[in-house]
Amino acid sequence: MDKSTQIPPDSFAARLKQAMAMRNLKQETLAEAAGVSQNTIHKLTSGKAQSTRKLIEIAAALGVSPVWLQTGEGAPAARSAVSVADGSPLVLEPLHPWDSDTPLDEDEVELPLYKEVEMSAGAGRTAVREIEGRKLRFSYATLRASGVDPSAAICAQLTGNSMEPLIMDGSTIGVDTATTHITDGEIYALEHDGMLRVKFVYRLPGGGIRLRSFNREEYPDEEYSPEDMRSRQISMIGWVFWWSTVRHRRGPSLVR
């Protein structure tokens, strides 16, 4: 093979081919599952294209972390994915309509919902609080697949574009409050002086942390020492094991 056509082992194309091999997926099968053309998958696997707007969909079909697929950081497998290799794409668990009067299924649990709220006498200050009367239903199977104890699981609503396009503004996230020990490159929810923040977290020497956004063009890395964390009231809420996004139209589509 000519050197000019060789694919670097640390490239997007190499990781995509590795993930397809692990799942025993062909290009046409992956393309159909992710909602893209086979030509798009061909360009990505050949190295002719280095990124795609369909990153999340492709990663979901492969059952891999979109962060690992795009950057090579972290573990390849999505923490909540079921390990299969039968040549079929992964599918998301279906959503079922319900209201407060709908009884729980045997395999369901209700999780409390938290969000950032403005304090009544805080002059614009906020705090992360549970929203009374608001619950989200999860299956025990989903929590078991992620290794999450249902009694430690909560949901929270994210605001801001710092993690886009991985986690969109307005997304609901699932948080394991029992997992606060930092694994470098994993995504965690934190409370920062009353703000709910979701970031990649890395350990620093001396007990500090580095916070990294997926949208690094607008949000540079932040580093905090243990003293900074105390003075700025930064505390770990838990590991983000799941998220779900409903897109909101902000204006005319740029794609025609």
From Swiss-Prot:
InterPro entries: Cro/C1-type_HTH (IPR001387), Lambda_DNA-bd_dom_sf (IPR010982), LexA-like (IPR039418), LexA/Signal_pep-like_sf (IPR036286), Peptidase_S24_S26A/B/C (IPR015927). Residues 16-69 form the HTH cro/C1-type domain. GO terms for biological process: bacteriocin biosynthetic process; negative regulation of secondary metabolite biosynthetic process. It comes from the Bacteria. The keyword Repressor applies. Keywords: Antibiotic biosynthesis, Bacteriocin biosynthesis, DNA-binding, Repressor, Transcription, Transcription regulation. One of its GO terms (molecular function) is DNA binding. Residues 27-46 bind DNA. Induction: Inactivated by the activated RecA protein after UV irradiation. Represses the promoter activity of the prtN gene. This is HTH-type transcriptional regulator PrtR. It comes from Pseudomonas aeruginosa (strain ATCC 15692 / DSM 22644 / CIP 104116 / JCM 14847 / LMG 12228 / 1C / PRS 101 / PAO1).
